[in-house]
Amino acid sequence: MNYQRLEKLGEGTYAHVYKGQNRVTGEIVALKVIRIDADEGTPSTAIREISLMKELRHPNIMSLSDVLQTENKLMLVFEYMEKDLKKYMDTYGNQGALPPSQVKNFTQQLLKGISFCHENRVLHRDLKPQNLLINSRGELKLADFGLARSIGIPVNTFSNEVVTLWYRAPDVLLGSRVYSTSIDIWSVGCIMAEMATGRPLFAGSNNEDQLLKIFRLLGTPTEQSWPGISLLPEYKPTFPIYKAQDLAYLFPTFDPLGLDLLRRMLRLQPELRTTGQDALQHAWFLTA
């Protein structure tokens, strides 16, 4: 084995992640060690992650440099990144909140990475601060493609058990099983808002609570504002009626252009949400 483990960085449902070193070159890397179950074989999440990450080469996507397999373990070798965005905010933020220039910089990098995924017909489906990694040069990269999916033509019927609850789009929460790149854009909007305040935008405790938190801020949708919403499995005609709040009041650090982009990403109706490419062309990124 050409790599030695230096320290444990974390663990997930099916893998442990270590800081490691290439014994030959001395390069510091991240090692994701996946247990292979004797009965079940390699987890489908690992197979998906490997196949997608081998194809997705971009400065804002974590690069997978090697895959090594033994009888009961699979080891993925990634470039080493110092912190995830959550830890970065906790370390350098003012009570977690980052300065406006940094929010803009990280939002732009995040949009570049996710737009590249979307151009290559891949949905990430699990964007959250813990899955965005930052290195010592301030480069932000998308990681953890274990839930990612290729977009089929026509749109596949995907499972609605995706994306950590707080970053989950309202259409997914309402049980829609036909969705596209717009679910990732919703997550980007939630992350952009969280970077500005240091707090998750919608920290719901369950599916319905999550929806009501969204409606409290953005207004309760109706059949008029979102045609077809009443047909979604989790829609209830008894949802409380909330009026949309003024985002400028909640996000005093955003200028009008920043607020405009945030609103475009957080449109309740998925078809009305901006795309990654359009978001990158937004005037907010053209101002200092």
From Swiss-Prot:
- Residues annotated as binding ATP are L9, G10, E11, G12, T13, Y14, A15, H16, V17, K32
According to its UniProt entry, one GO biological process term is:
negative regulation of sister chromatid cohesion
Q: Which UniProt keywords apply?
A: ATP-binding, Kinase, Nucleotide-binding, Phosphoprotein, Serine/threonine-protein kinase, Transferase
**Residue numbers annotated as active site:** D126
Q: Name one Pfam family in it.
A: Pkinase
The answer to whether the entry has keyword Transit peptide is no
The record's GO molecular-function terms, alphabetically, read: ATP binding; cyclin-dependent protein serine/threonine kinase activity; protein serine kinase activity
Sites of the modification Phosphothreonine? T13
Protein origin, superkingdom: Eukaryota
Please tell me one Gene Ontology term that the record gives under cellular component: cytosol
**Sites of the modification Phosphotyrosine?**
Y14
Keyword Nucleotide-binding on entry: yes
Q: Which residues form the Protein kinase domain?
A: 3-285
Q: Which reaction is this enzyme known to catalyze?
A: L-seryl-[protein] + ATP = O-phospho-L-seryl-[protein] + ADP + H(+); L-threonyl-[protein] + ATP = O-phospho-L-threonyl-[protein] + ADP + H(+)
Q: EC class of this enzyme?
A: transferase
EC number assigned by the record: 2.7.11.22
- Family annotation (PANTHER family): CELL DIVISION PROTEIN KINASE (PTHR24056), CYCLIN-DEPENDENT KINASE 5 (PTHR24056:SF46)
Subunit structure, interactors included: Interacts with the pas1 cyclin.
The record's family statement is: Belongs to the protein kinase superfamily. CMGC Ser/Thr protein kinase family. CDC2/CDKX subfamily.
Protein name as it appears in the record: Serine/threonine-protein kinase pef1
- Native organism is Schizosaccharomyces pombe (strain 972 / ATCC 24843) (Fission yeast)
Gene label: pef1
